[in-house]
Regions:
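Conserved N-terminal phosphate-binding loop of PLP-dependent enzymes in the Aspartate aminotransferase
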Residues: 1-405
Length: 405
């Protein structure tokens, strides 16, 4: 939809949003009207260099032509049914995902938080059915983030964070331990613990990758204690971190893994994959969804996954991510650069505010975001080049210099 075809102005659009929408977002003051590859364009055709990819969604590029074509083709065949009949996109995507990442079964959802809800439910049901009614406890990481629905929100180890404040008591059955502290996780487990649930990189927590010792230690500890290892790959999954799934960087395999974002290439979809044994916890009636496995979303996801794999965008994420980090480390006021592939966080010293850098970059037509007082995060499409990174670094440097004045 183009603004010129509506007879409205950009201010009219903003007025309608302010009047009718419940706003929980700090809006950027521009209209995203069209997009292609590494750029988003406003109503005047002004390009914005996209280093956020719709929050790690558009990994094969904005409006990837093969994804767009898959959506158009599927819309003309069948847009929606329910999960009683079989559909071709569901079946083909299930095979592609499971065979690619080495898991046995998949269950479709609509989003990342729903995928994490399903993962929590499956783990608890598995524990209760196999070991008895008290085996439902799950240990998660402090400063993690798993979503905004009640189970996922309760699993988020940030008591007092805005996503938890004001909603009353959290769902019972979770404990939190410091990230990358293997012994603390072991100590947090009890005889009632059925699972440990972590992100391989804490994105919202400031872009902190897990250590090899931590991830391999969790896998070993879970194996030794009849516990499940749940890995949240909503943000890290599908080539973002230099491997198809981030857990592959650690040479381990989860019992259940959640995914969303990049899986759909811009269409809403989430999923969990599980081992055959754990997947048996779900049977008819134990979980369900109206829109999960939507034919159009599955068609888009299949096209997106094929693009990511055929173009080796995991390899590009590793190569360009290392290059980008090396350039960012040379900027003034940079305290630390943390990254895994193209999930990149830059922490500045106390004189530079992350939000100030974010807004300064927006003024210079670069889209990034801020997390924490002095941290910016960048999650560009995985088609990004070293030249794109050079442009971004130059804009960030110019912004930093303007904040020194």
């Amino acid at each position: 939809m183009k603004l010129k075809d509506t007879g409205l102005t950009f201010q009219d659009i903003k007025d309608k949003v302010n009047k009718y929408m419940i706003e929980t977002y700090e809006r950027f003051d521009f209209l995203a009207e069209t997009a292609e590859d590494m750029y988003i364009y406003d109503e005047n055709g002004t390009p914005y260099l996209d280093f956020y990819a719709g929050i790690a969604v558009n990994s094969a590029g904005n409006c990837n032509p093969k994804v767009v074509a898959a959506v158009k083709d599927q819309v003309e065949d069948i847009m929606h049914t329910f999960n009683y009949p079989y559909t071709i996109p569901q079946a083909l995507l299930a095979e592609k995902v499971c065979e690619t990442i080495g898991m046995d079964k998949i269950f479709y959802q609509n989003s990342g938080t729903e995928a994490n809800e399903a993962m929590i439910k499956m783990a608890r049901k598995y524990g209760i059915e196999k070991y008895g009614p008290n085996r439902y406890h799950i240990v998660t990481a402090k400063m993690g983030f798993h979503g905004r629905t009640f189970g996922a929100m309760s699993a988020t180890g940030q008591p007092g964070n805005g996503c938890q404040v004001g909603f009353g008591p959290m769902t019972y059955g979770f404990s939190y331990a410091p990230y990358n502290d293997l012994q603390a996780f072991k100590d947090a487990c009890t005889e009632n613990t059925i699972a440990i649930m972590v992100e391989p990189v804490q994105g919202e927590g400031g872009v902190h990758p897990a250590t090899m010792e931590f991830m391999q230690g969790l896998r070993k500890f879970c194996d030794e204690n009849d516990m499940l290892l749940l890995i949240d790959e909503v943000q890290t999954g599908w080539c973002r971190t230099g491997a198809v799934m981030s857990y592959m960087n650690y040479g381990i395999k989860p019992d259940i893994v959640s995914m969303a974002k990049a899986l759909g290439g811009g269409m809403p979809i989430g999923a969990i994959c599980a081992t055959a044994e754990v997947a048996k916890a779900f049977s008819a009636g134990s979980h369900g969804t109206t829109f999960g496995g939507h034919p159009v979303s599955c068609a888009a996801a299949l096209a997106e996954v094929n693009e990511l794999l055929d173009r080796d965008l995991a390899g590009n994420a590793k190569k360009v991510g290392d290059y980008f980090a090396s350039k960012l480390e040379k900027l003034p006021h940079v305290k630390e650069v943390r990254h895994q592939g193209l999930l990149v966080g830059v922490e500045f010293d106390d004189t530079i505010g992350g939000v100030d850098v974010k807004h300064g970059c927006l003024d210079r037509k670069l889209l990034i975001t801020a997390i924490g007082a002095h941290i910016i995060r960048m999650i560009p499409p995985l088609i990004v080049t070293e030249e794109d990174c050079d442009k971004a670094v130059a804009i960030i440097e110019d912004t930093i210099k303007s904040l020194e004045k």
